[in-house]
């Protein structure tokens, strides 16, 4: 026989939907030379943050990933973090 569970179901939390910053502000462009902007989309370990974390749309997340990779190639951004 199965044991009856007395646990209550978890309360449902409202889902926060983030809007893409670049779709909201049409004049803001993604450029590999803008390291201040790109650093906000890189974790402290040097990884590119996921789309579900940043809240960007698919196209702008791809553009950010491409810009980060280009900035790494021209040594504007590090490939890894300097923290050990």
Curated annotation (Swiss-Prot):
Superkingdom as given in the UniProt entry: Bacteria
Gene Ontology CC terms: cytosolic small ribosomal subunit
Keyword Ribonucleoprotein: yes
Entry keyword Nucleotidyltransferase: no
A Pfam family per the record: Ribosomal_S18
Keyword set, alphabetical order: Ribonucleoprotein, Ribosomal protein, RNA-binding, rRNA-binding
Coiled coil feature spans: none
GO biological process: translation
GO molecular function: small ribosomal subunit rRNA binding; structural constituent of ribosome
NCBIfam families in the record: S18
Oligomer status and interactors: Part of the 30S ribosomal subunit. Forms a tight heterodimer with protein bS6.
Cited function: Binds as a heterodimer with protein bS6 to the central domain of the 16S rRNA, where it helps stabilize the platform of the 30S subunit.
Stated family: Belongs to the bacterial ribosomal protein bS18 family.
Protein name: Small ribosomal subunit protein bS18A
Annotated source species: Mycobacterium tuberculosis (strain ATCC 25618 / H37Rv)
Gene name, Swiss-Prot/TrEMBL: rpsR1
């Amino acid at each position: 026989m199965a044991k009856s569970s007395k646990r209550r179901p978890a309360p449902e939390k409202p889902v926060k939907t983030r809007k893409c910053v670049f779709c909201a502000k049409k004049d803001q462009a993604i450029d590999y030379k803008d390291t201040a902007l790109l650093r906000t989309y890189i974790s402290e370990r040097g990884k590119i943050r996921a789309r579900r974390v940043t809240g960007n749309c698919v196209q702008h997340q791809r553009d950010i990933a491409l810009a980060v990779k280009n900035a790494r190639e021209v040594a504007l951004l590090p490939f890894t973090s300097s923290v050990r």
